Amino acid sequence: VKLYDYVLDHLSLPFQQPGNKIRSAVLFHSEHYQVGKNALFEMIRLGLGKDNCTIITPENAVARERNFLENQLVLIDEILIDGDYKKRLSTLNILKPLMTQELHDSRPLFKNWRQVHSTCKMMLFTNFKNAISVKNNEARYTIIDVGKTRDEMGGDEFFNLFWNTDGTIVEEYPEIVKWFLSTRQISPNFNPKSISLKTKFLETMSKEGGHPLLPE
């Protein structure tokens, strides 16, 4: 499957097969800012419904409450795991079972531990090449470099089409995104239980992120 279709398959599955868990995650990297991440995340969130999609920080992702597990799609924003490779390794080892397993321990504030069944899918975004520590044969993260600036993508003339002056998304666009992702054919060879696609940028992030993760 081509990378373009692979990403669309990841986005389509929560709309078409909400109970089918994807056991890997897509991580977008861009060294540039204002390249449409917020517009994409918000349109997906509104398309799925606010109760089915949430945007969280890395700190929320590893906290014991894990309220986000009840969503169909979890978007983890501004990934940058501070500290040495050991801390990055520890954090990713917490995240990986959340991506690959369906039963998780959760402890909401002032409540006892409980077990939660979740088929949530995950996507991540970062502006930093050294955001995580991954080995060159990492099998659970498809790491994609968004190699264009805002101007190269069309600049304000393009991006302003999606936003109202009050900072909200133009109402029709989430519906268009929802229709497209709900009706497009998922690639016949896309296997949500399979390993991630290996990209050229995986090697870059492996070098920049310090000591690599051990493979599963």
Locations of regions flagged by a protein language model:
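P-loop NTPase catalytic core of nucleic-acid-dependent motor ATPases
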Residues: V1-I79, V177, L181
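DNA transaction DNA-binding modules
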Residues: H32-Y33, P188-E216
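Conserved catalytic/switch belt of AAA+ P-loop NTPases
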Residues: G49, L89-R114
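AAA+/SF3 P-loop NTPase mechanochemical coupling elements
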Residues: A63-L69, R107-F125
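Short glycine-/polar-rich loops that comprise or flank the Walker A/P-loop
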Residues: E70-Q72, S118-K121, N136-Y141
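Conserved AAA+/SF3 P-loop NTPase catalytic/coupling segment centered on the Walker-B
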Residues: Q72-M99, A131-E138
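A short helix-turn-beta junction within AAA+ P-loop NTPase domains corresponding to the substrate/partner-engaging
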Residues: I132-E152
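Conserved phosphate-binding loops in nucleotide/dinucleotide-binding enzymes
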Residues: R150-T168
